[in-house]
């Protein structure tokens, strides 16, 4: 099953101070690469770039993004159909951030699950999630 990476998972990985958390995120990322099940919505790249840039600066953000881009995950671009599906999810779930709607729509389209502990996702019918 495809696993759609949410920004919260990647930011947990990049910001992990706890060795156990870092070990678990590394293990998950390695398995997703090895099994070619990892999916990276393009909106997540934007969210991660912004968060790391604000926290650690532009150079650090670019370094992390280069590593992420070379990790071999399938990058899903926001196309018109996905945008429509995300917009309709937003209409039904007004408190769900638009980026999360795009991530949820990606998971629903691919029949995958979102790697996140974000409680927003539990509101979307038929959406599966997993965490470290």
Regions from the language model: what does each represent?
Residues 74-115:
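Active-site neighborhoods of divalent-metal-dependent phosphate/nucleic-acid chemistry enzymes
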Residues 33, 69, 108:
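Anion (oxyanion) recognition and catalysis
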Residues 104, 108-132:
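Acidic, PIN/NYN-like endoribonuclease modules and their adjacent C-terminal/linker elements
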Residues 5-6, 40-42, 95-97, 118, ...:
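Histidine- and aromatic-rich ligand-binding microenvironments
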């Amino acid at each position: 099953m495809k696993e759609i990476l949410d920004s919260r998972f990647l930011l947990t990985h990049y910001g992990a101070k706890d060795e156990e958390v870092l070990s678990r995120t590394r293990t998950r990322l390695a398995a997703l690469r090895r099994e070619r099940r990892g999916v990276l919505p393009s909106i997540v790249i934007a969210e991660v770039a912004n968060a790391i840039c604000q926290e650690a600066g532009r150079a650090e953000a670019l370094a992390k993004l280069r590593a992420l881009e070379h990790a071999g995950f399938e990058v899903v671009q926001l196309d018109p159909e996905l945008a429509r599906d995300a917009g309709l999810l937003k209409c039904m779930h007004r408190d769900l951030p638009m980026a999360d709607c795009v991530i949820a729509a990606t998971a629903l389209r691919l029949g995958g699950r979102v790697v996140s502990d974000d409680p927003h996702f539990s509101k979307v019918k038929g959406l599966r999630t997993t965490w470290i």
